[in-house]
């Protein structure tokens, strides 16, 4: 390889990194063509500015043509940026001479490269630089292709050497365009979606510039504050509230997709009556849409929501094994202000899936729901999945930990999503309260997994065949019991008396999802101290339990026939009488009924 050509290639590669890419349209166009050299030099690459040759690279055979094409590409990039002739300079670097455009190297010339042209490096550098200055000094126009959002305006500078007045013509009604003489820019407003061209002309040149008018993939309206409850509300609940609020404010275009991420890592648990501000990252994209990026800051309040017993229990468990994707449960809140939904399903589709609980607003006004939730799984141990879901729900319910979710009119809002691996069980409980009157429907369906679940507008609605099934009003039972030291043991059955559903003949065997509030009176009429133990024992098959005893959570291990688990012990002084408050709930995946037993220790 000849030394001069080697230096040229080195600096061509360096310039490729630093020069701007070629994306604009220009009436000054550089091209590279192959020309014949003598037998010693071989093929050469000549660069033209329009019809005028400006430089010729040679000495390396076919590679010289490729090098010339690369130089032409970078000169076009400079033309598109409106390079001034005065920016073309030459500089000596030891024995060689370099042509620069501003601070960017175009080519470096040494004796070997100059010898091909029968001259020296300095003269060749000045000749080529003069050719480039002449080319960049001629009248020309350069404008980058324009992308304008519908309903917005964008300005694109006209670069180059303008001669005389400028006119701008549009070829379609999608956009409007005008020339800003003061800023030497064309201003374009997007009216509708479409692709067209602008014809930009001065006294010497005419240029066709592509224009695209497009919608953003989404738009964020608002802002609106988010709401949580709990003493305190933890970070994960704050995240749910903020993301649900932002999702309801995000107007997503058909076919677009989006992600919402609330940054709660540095947010401490939120006490009742307090508030915090949470940064959120929103991004949306889609085919034929403009990418949308926003970083709003959302205020979240820990507000007071009355926690009255719910009106109805809804159970999604038939069938327990879901063999296909689709809708498997629907319940209406039209006649209720609150509901508790228990779901317990096995993913038998053979593929990973998402179990989705969504709220549908069938009314003509926006509404808000308050949710308290607990989920278990995915797990191949269905008793463990049900136990974990019940434990999490009862814990959140006891502390009032929940969030509010806006539900815009005519939209379906995924309020709770659980991923299920093949063969695994998902089990959970949601307590839902309507904070404003409305016609809400709750639906449970299995779906292929998605990276994010967002509200969507209903194109139409028709009730599912499941609507109104497996509904059980007043899902709370109060039980009074007593145990007297020295007398017979006390037994409290949990799940033995099935509550009735709204459909004739429907009974909820096991009372899964029903809250039991038990007042157990313990008395010691003897003259001696006594210790009373409270235990849980299965009523038939294997079962687990979660019991809240005087505000203390107790979880049992997996109980089998003829086994038992201690729940609490109380030391009673002679003549002492005390009442123990117990709350529990039959949980999915276990065999209920079970029994609580009070007996002497």
Regions found by a protein language model. Give the residues of each.
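Asparagine-centered strand-capping/turn motif at beta-strand->loop junctions
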Residues: 345-353, 358-367, 371-373, 377, ...
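A short beta-strand micro-motif common to beta-rich folds, especially ectodomain repeats
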Residues: 192-204, 276-284, 428-430
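N-terminal targeting peptides and non-cytosolic leader segments immediately upstream
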Residues: 25-142, 149-152, 180-185
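Terminal connector regions
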Residues: 421-457, 586-601
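C-terminal functional regions that serve as terminal interaction/effector modules
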Residues: 273-275, 282-289, 522-601
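Extracytoplasmic soluble-region selector
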Residues: 135-220, 247, 256-264
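Short aromatic-acidic-glycine turn motif
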Residues: 303-310, 365, 375-392, 540-550
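Intrinsically disordered, low-complexity Pro/Gly/Ser/Thr-rich segments with frequent PxxP/GP/PP motifs
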Residues: 387-423, 551-581
